[in-house]
Amino acid sequence: HLFDGGAARTNLSFDAAPVTKLSKPGLVSETVVAQDGPGASLVYCATRRETERMAEALAAIPLDAAAYHAGLGRETRHKVLDDYLSGRLTAIAATNAFGMGVDKPDIRQVIHADVPGSLENYLQEAGRAGRDGAPASCRLLFDPSQIEGHFQRQSQNRLTRREIGRVLKALREMAQRFARDGEIIVSVD
């Protein structure tokens, strides 16, 4: 069976708040503590170091929290993920390495401690909140002094229309050369 839930997620509320590097751990902690009722919190961070810093701030509350990123050993990552999915951890601070294939329906809040790489990333990551249909919140924290530089770096990473055209032309030539019928599927991240 295939079910289409549509794109509208009326159970999610969104807000954004300015933050500085110094005030960020406190604001993340306040946001997590202010959550009403049971459920988990997910804090997305841009770097491994920042996940460690946010997890330490949450653990100091004290709160059952841990960091999750690709730099952790495989066993540690599996344990953190298992503890989070089972409810032994109420909060996790993670890079975008967390998420693909992870289904935890009771995430009550997703906090972006850093501005994500793209709007698509933000929507996908924020969409991990409230998958059970219950109310959930999505909060984006941003450092006003770093916004301009962030978007300049992002714009430099984008392919130009001309470069995309070259890629498509090369793919078409490849398809003709190998005499393949059907479609060529390309994923660009």
Tell what function each PLM region has:
Residues H1-D189:
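Helicase motor core with emphasis on the C-terminal RecA-like subdomain
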